[in-house]
Regions:
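A short, Lys/Arg-rich alpha-helix, primarily the initiator
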Residues: 1-16, 103-107
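Helix-turn-helix DNA-binding elements, focusing on the entry/boundary residues of the two helices
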Residues: 10, 21, 33, 48-51
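Residues in the recognition helix of alpha-helical DNA-binding motifs
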Residues: 13, 27, 38-39, 68
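Short, basic-rich loop-to-helix N-cap that marks the start of a DNA-contacting helix
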Residues: 18, 42-56, 72
């Protein structure tokens, strides 16, 4: 059974660095700390630009900041990759299909250890 991950670690890393919500809000170019609070409480996912800004500010990769969400997405993609492997296995085994299958098998093989 996979270990449980928190939905996100924004607050953990922000506090570890000694940054206030107000300071992170300023670095994000926002006016109100409400957005940072909403993200820390995982009531809403940040947009891509804000996610990238968090990675710059906190110096932590996105998959670590949002470990729980990453884990969920990884599991879903792994299940889909298994289904795609089954579909592709019925095709002619040309070089292109072989490359696809090899890549898909790496997705399925070790969920939780990639990145």
């Amino acid at each position: 059974m996979p270990s449980f991950k928190l939905a996100n670690y924004l607050r953990t890393h922000r506090k570890r660095l000694g940054l206030s919500q107000d300071e992170v809000t300023f670095l994000l170019g926002r006016q109100s700390t409400a957005l940072v609070s909403v993200h820390e409480q995982f009531r809403r996912l940040p947009c891509l630009r804000t996610l990238l800004a968090y990675t710059v500010i906190l110096q932590i990769p996105a998959h670590e900041l949002f470990a729980g969400e990453y884990q969920k997405v990884e599991q879903v993609v792994s299940r889909r990759a298994k289904r795609l492997i089954e579909r592709l296995a019925t095709e002619n085994p040309d070089q292109r299909t072989a490359r696809k299958l090899a890549h898909l098998r790496t997705i399925v093989a070790t969920p939780g250890t990639r990145v």
